[in-house]
Amino acid sequence: MVAGAFRVLYDAKTIMTTPHQKRDMRPRGEKKEAVFHDGIERVTLSFYRYVKIENPERFCNELCERFTILGCLGRIYIAKEGINAQMNVPKINWDQFDAFIKTKPELVGVPYKLAVEEKNAPSFYKLIVKVKKKIVADGLSDESFDVTNTGAYLSAREFNDYVNDPDAVVVDMRNAYESEIGHFENAVTPQVDTFREELKVAPELLKIHKNKKIALYCTGGIRCEKASAWLKHNGFQNVRHLKGGIIDYKHQVARENLENKFKGKNFVFDERMSESIGEEIISYCHLCSNTKSDTHYHCKNLACHVLFLGCDTCIEKKKGYCSYKCVTFDRLPKQVKKLFTRNSHKNKPEQFKKHRLMGKR
């Protein structure tokens, strides 16, 4: 498909709602089908930068217009503190995309983290460019906190040295459901569901290691960079973080023929759900707790929609549901189920108020 066709396809389908948010308003199923069958080869990437953006709304509009024309899909969050982008770009339009990024002073030289692996299904099937208060939700309200006062970067080679050093502490700054399917050897993996929660507990959790060397890591670098600044703000002196996160670590290991210290898969927030970093399966099915599995599913009961790990046997036995309660609930009349939609959280039965199941570690 030629570049001009992207303008027709995507301009016609993207509805500009407000200066804060531009979204494709077609039904979810229609969007997924259209992208899945369009035959366009895409490059999945992520990038972020903590940089002062004077007018996030205008910046949002400019990016949305250009990304729409180029046929880009994904989630791009913009705030006064910077930009956080997870997206894919039609390969045929990559040079135009890269040239556009370089026209933005705020983005010149921003490093791209290219996906470790592309899968059969596209990583994204819609484009969202949105203005937010923060590019990654942190729950912090301390006006004296300087997000730019970060720890130094660690290369993959240096990070491996930290992993091997008994006097160093390696900390996973991702959520528990992410580290469950993959993490670095000997890493501290806090049992939290959100980055906001982890920032809250990290200073207390790590205070016994305050005088040690601390190395932080996350998916692509955005969370551990902010976390390094937060720990320094709380009196930690020797804090560093993995440059480019797990994604770039994998690329560095391959380029430099280094030992891979990451075990399992890297959870990603797109349609792929994960990328293979190590060869091991380290997690277990949440339904039986006996069979190893690193494949995530969402419960077919939309009132639940919990994220869980399932083995082939349990998925077949429960038909894609996380429990027999959900199987039973989903057989209720449609009028009854409407009372318990995902958007009516306070009305849900107690068993549907959880976000995800945590299984055997």
Residue ranges and their predicted role:
Residues 170-172:
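Structural scaffold elements adjacent to functional motifs in cytosolic proteins
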Residues 219:
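Substrate-contacting helices/loops that form the catalytic groove of nucleic-acid
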Residues 12, 17-152, 165, 175-213, ...:
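Rhodanese-like catalytic fold shared by cysteine-dependent sulfurtransferases
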Residues 155-160:
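Phosphate-interacting basic helix/loop segments used at nucleotide- and nucleic-acid interfaces
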Residues 1-16:
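N-terminal amphipathic/basic-hydrophobic helices that include classical n-h-c signal peptides
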